[in-house]
Every structure is written in C-alpha cells, then in structure tokens.
Amino acid sequence: MNGAALWGAYYRLNPDKFCADYLHLSLKRFQKFLLVMMFWSTTFVLIACRGLGKTYLSAIYCVVRCILYPGTRVCIASGTRGQAINVLEKIIQELKPKSTELCAEINEKETRINGNNAQIAFKNTSIIKVVTASDSSRGNRCNVLLLDEYRLISKDTIDTVLKKFLTFRRLPLYAELTDEEKKREYDKEKNLTLWLTSPFFKDHWSYTKCVDTYNAMLDDSRRQFVCGFPYELSIHEGLLDPEIVADEMAERGAQFICAHIRNQVFDGDTIQVVLSGSMHCKLPSEVYVNK
C-alpha cells in the first residue's frame, strides 16, 4: 500500500507522466503545461482558438482526475447538452481504445451516453456527468465544474445554479487518521472550476472573467490561472492546415478573427486584444520553444 500511495502522490504532481504511463498518450508540450495548471488551479480559464483541442484536453483532465482522486464528481455544462456530451464521447471513442488500463477503470454497467442521461462511471466511485445549463439542474453536486464554451452559457445561470454545485466535498476515509487530522486533510483539497471557450468580443462578460482571473493570478495567495492561445499555435503543432486557415480567413474575415485570433496582451489592469504582433505574457520563458 505504501508503494501505491507513493505512485499516487507522484502522478498527482505529474499528471502528464500519468497520461504517458497509464493512458499511453503522447501529449504536446502546451497540452502538458495546461494539464499541470488544471491540477494546480482552483480557477482555470483557457481562451483558445478553435481546433486547438479544448474538448480533447478536457476529456483527458476528467479521466486523470477521476482515477487519481477516487470518489470525484465532475459536472460538465455547456451552451447545449450536445456540446457537453462531446467530452464523454472523446473519452469513449479516443482515450479508451488506447488504454486497457482505462478500460479496466470504467464501470460499464453504470456508464451511459444519451440525450437525457449522460455519464461515465468509474469503479472507484468517481463519476463524470453532463448537466443542463438551466434551472432544471438544481440539486447536482460536484468537486469539479467544467464549463465548456462558457461564453454560450448565461452568466446568471452560472452564478445562481452551476456554481452552487461546488458545495460537495470529496471525503476519503483516511481510516488511520483522527477526526482532527481528517479535517486538516479535507481542507487541503479544494473544489475547482474550469472555464474553457473560444475567443469572443471584449464587450461580452466572458472577457471580464478573463480580466478578473488575471488580476487574481497576480496574488500569490490564490491559485487562479488564465491564458489565451491563437491559431498560430494550432498550425505550429500540426493541428490546423495552414491552407485551410488561409481560405477561411479570406472567406469569413471578422468572424475568423473572432473565433481564431486571441493574442492577449496583459498590460497593467487591463487585457488588450490585438490582431497582429507577438504575444507578451507573464509566463516562464522555458514553456516556449524559441527557434
């Protein structure tokens, strides 16, 4: 059991290693970086161009979290149930075939994906569940709230319904600890919210969320993180075809800019969106490959 505890602690600190060893995935550098920050943050905001693989990364995070933290409850909400169900489909159709270990973790009897009831259950009692972003979802509880394309969800619904899900706390047994020791351990593990979306206009509330999270990120006592990636990263990593991007840019103009270009310049108390030039951000230089 000591060996299992050591490996569990190691993989919790290095989720990218878990993806390689257990899920047999070869992640790109930016995916490793984002995955680690997902585990570190209590509030994680990602503004990424379409085609960067937000849903795929969300699926990876949910699986790793549920395996390494038994009894985890993940609720996924989006503008439509179909968009939220895409995360579960990524797990079943893309992640599961690559890993016999993941197949062994999933409780097939309790797993179902349909329009009204979509969830993936794990044998360690963890669950990934799709919820509707409306008043009808009141009563759900979770440790992790994933908001996919959060700009499409009403801010009022997020504040009055979805955020209330996070009143549930994961409570491992800790059989060898006293009640006081258990309480201290429970306090160490915080519930968290993941906000993911493609770029949108500055006058939308989703932009204000980015600014607020950035200001909180500057406070070392808080674990909040925000970043934005433009379409150039997708091309650099081979996720987008440059010719297709050029054609779409010529055809759609401003719509393409809104959906794909999000160079966020952090300048004092504001985030300015620019359409050309390089990205200046307060991140370690070793994250990027300079050529």
Predicted regions and their residues:
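Pre-P-loop entry segment of helicase/translocase ATPase cores
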Residues: 1-43, 282, 288
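Post-Walker A helix-loop "phosphate-sensing" segment adjacent to the P-loop in P-loop NTPases
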Residues: 65-72
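Inter-Walker segment of RecA-like/P-loop motor cores
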Residues: 90-143
